[in-house]
Amino acid sequence: MDERLVSSEADNHESVIEQSLRPQNLAQYIGQHKVKENLRVFIDAAKMRQETLDHVLLYGPPGLGKTTLASIVANEMGVELRTTSGPAIERPGDLAAILTALEPGDVLFIDEIHRLHRSIEEVLYPAMEDFCLDIVIGKGPSARSVRLDLPPFTLVGATTRVGLLTAPLRDRFGVMSRLEYYTQEELADIVTRTADVFEVEIDKPSALEIARRSRGTPRVANRLLRRVRDFAQVLGDSRITEDISQNALERLQVDRLGLDHIDHKLLMGMIEKFNGGPVGLDTISATIGEESHTIEDVYEPYLLQIGFIQRTPRGRIVTPAVYHHFQMEAPRYD
């Protein structure tokens, strides 16, 4: 799969950069107003009662700030954040080691929690519900179960695929919050804030131009800002102006809707070779040289969100909006 500027996934290097850009409290966090307002109430109530915050599940598309919110929850509660991920916990013993190392009140953040193995989930149930850990010592007839008490803690789980969570795990979260895509105005505020952190001057039209092409996702907005900053430093006087931002984004092949060259290849392939569809996923895969699951999981969600493709029983079709975007005449069916 080609590297994409508009991908909502983060690589390891980018995760380090994101950490330096993260707001430290709810007041600094831009967007997600309903989620913030509710978390403010839950956090304040827990602090007033001198209790740990109830377990929190954050779900929604990647790149919207789930990890940042987990860090903010820990900061607001005045406790430490311990971070891991579903794929990193391979055995029940791995989870037991993490849980027994927690201090009272700590926040344990598990990213991609939907990827936990079922046997590991079963260890997590009593830990979440009763703050205890059941460990089996020995094997065969002589095996016995020992219960270890754990300090009270808050589990913050994050997932992009909440439907893959088992019902027993999902039901143990007292707070469930869905993160939504951001508005252009919110993304422009994020771009402006990030530019301040980078000590780069940017005007409002430029921030809006970057926001418009960021697919509703802060991670994409910050990535595009970093690349536009490169153009401003090399081709200009380090200030990000509207001309610089438009020129940079055109050279980066990110159009005004946030579509990149791969999106264009997919959509134009459907139009030119299949008259706009319907066409099956495997056929699209063979046509553009990408895996079917990559198309379905990576490329399609945004195209579906903006109404550029539709899924039908007979396959995918492009909508009239695609022809309008590419300034083409839509076919007429008599």
From Swiss-Prot:
DNA binds at R311, R316. One of its GO terms (molecular function) is ATP binding. Keywords: ATP-binding, Cytoplasm, DNA damage, DNA recombination, DNA repair, DNA-binding, Hydrolase, Nucleotide-binding. This is Holliday junction branch migration complex subunit RuvB. The RuvA-RuvB-RuvC complex processes Holliday junction (HJ) DNA during genetic recombination and DNA repair, while the RuvA-RuvB complex plays an important role in the rescue of blocked DNA replication forks via replication fork reversal (RFR). RuvA specifically binds to HJ cruciform DNA, conferring on it an open structure. The RuvB hexamer acts as an ATP-dependent pump, pulling dsDNA into and through the RuvAB complex. RuvB forms 2 homohexamers on either side of HJ DNA bound by 1 or 2 RuvA tetramers; 4 subunits per hexamer contact DNA at a time. ATP binds at L21, R22, G63, K66, T67, T68, E129, D130, F131, R172, Y182, R219. The gene is ruvB. Pfam families: AAA_lid_4, RuvB_C, RuvB_N. It is an enzyme of class 3 (hydrolase). Its main location: cytoplasm. The keyword Hydrolase applies. Mg(2+) binds at T67. InterPro entries: AAA+_ATPase, AAA_lid_4, DNA_helicase_Holl-junc_RuvB, P-loop_NTPase, RuvB-like_N, RuvB_C, WH-like_DNA-bd_sf, WH_DNA-bd_sf. One of its GO terms (cellular component) is Holliday junction resolvase complex. Has 3 domains, the large (RuvB-L) and small ATPase (RuvB-S) domains and the C-terminal head (RuvB-H) domain. The head domain binds DNA, while the ATPase domains jointly bind ATP, ADP or are empty depending on the state of the subunit in the translocation cycle. During a single DNA translocation step the structure of each domain remains the same, but their relative positions change. One of its GO terms (biological process) is DNA recombination. Residues 256-334 are annotated as: Head domain (RuvB-H). Belongs to the RuvB family. CDD domains: AAA. It catalyses: ATP + H2O = ADP + phosphate + H(+). The keyword Iron does not apply. Disruption phenotype: RecD2 is synthetically lethal with ruvAB. Residues 183-253 are annotated as: Small ATPAse domain (RuvB-S). Residues 1-182 are annotated as: Large ATPase domain (RuvB-L). Its EC number is 3.6.4.-. Homohexamer. Forms an RuvA(8)-RuvB(12)-Holliday junction (HJ) complex. HJ DNA is sandwiched between 2 RuvA tetramers; dsDNA enters through RuvA and exits via RuvB. An RuvB hexamer assembles on each DNA strand where it exits the tetramer. Each RuvB hexamer is contacted by two RuvA subunits (via domain III) on 2 adjacent RuvB subunits; this complex drives branch migration. In the full resolvosome a probable DNA-RuvA(4)-RuvB(12)-RuvC(2) complex forms which resolves the HJ. Homohexamer which interacts with RecU. It is found in: Cytoplasm.
